[in-house]
Amino acid sequence: MRIILKIVFLSLSLVPVRPLADGAPPASPAAALEARFDPAPPAPPLEHGKAFTGDATPVEPGRVEVELAYAPSWWATAGAVDRLSGQQHQVAASVTVGLLPDVDARVVVGWALVHAAPEAPGAPAYGEGLADTTLAARWRFLSLADPGIDLAVSAGVTVPTGRRAAPDRLGTGRDAWNVGGSLLASADLGRFTMGAELGFSAPVGPPTSNDVGLLVCNAALGYQALAWLQPELELNYQHEIELGAQPDERVLWATAALVIPVDAVRLVVGGRFPVWARDAEVGPMATAAAKFAF
């Protein structure tokens, strides 16, 4: 299985101090002292969303978030003579709705294009079409203000709406229903924001492959440098459990990304690269996403 602004800096120029208008009284010493000791402006708000790690902060009731994402990926097997390689380009759209305090729901639909070196003469090397659809819900069961910690659980089902493989084309889905869940955590420490995710998914129904299930472990660390800029790093681990003699597929990625929250819009751009793998077809993956809140 293939594990799938120009930023304008506003500068302030120095301008000469305008003289007081005739008859305007100077500021009193008390007012000057109060202005001098005004508290510093608050730190910028922290954004919990990350590139590849889920967060534990649900959408508020009655609010809606729409996200558009593009995620190309490349992979290759080890070896020189029998090396196999390929790439996938996926576009996804998701809608998340806040249902209740601490509860939201999401639906994700997508389209994918797959190109791979044929595994045998005459085998298909290309495929395109709808991707699988995901329906999920998230419940935050703990929220602390000091220290800032959110804990949540999510559960979801993946519907095999992807185009099935055929003798003349590659498939764009898993050809099986999948159910899964995750434990999510988000935490704040000053301007640092951290996230963690532990999840598992498994196919249900008649078996269509050797896949038993997929374990996911993600950890992320971001720094809110400015109100509109948060660089972040992640470690992403996936372990696909296989049946029979086929070995399990294990991959560890390192991710670098920029999270750019601007009012009701959040942009994410980043990439992840495999740093360790066993028995898996792996390669780099990128993401570019825009989320709009209403």
Residue locations for each model-derived region?
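Sec-dependent signal peptide recognition
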Residues: 2-10
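N-terminal signal peptide c-region/cleavage motif recognized by signal peptidases
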Residues: 16-17
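Transmembrane beta-barrel domains of Gram-negative outer membranes and organellar outer membranes
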Residues: 22-292
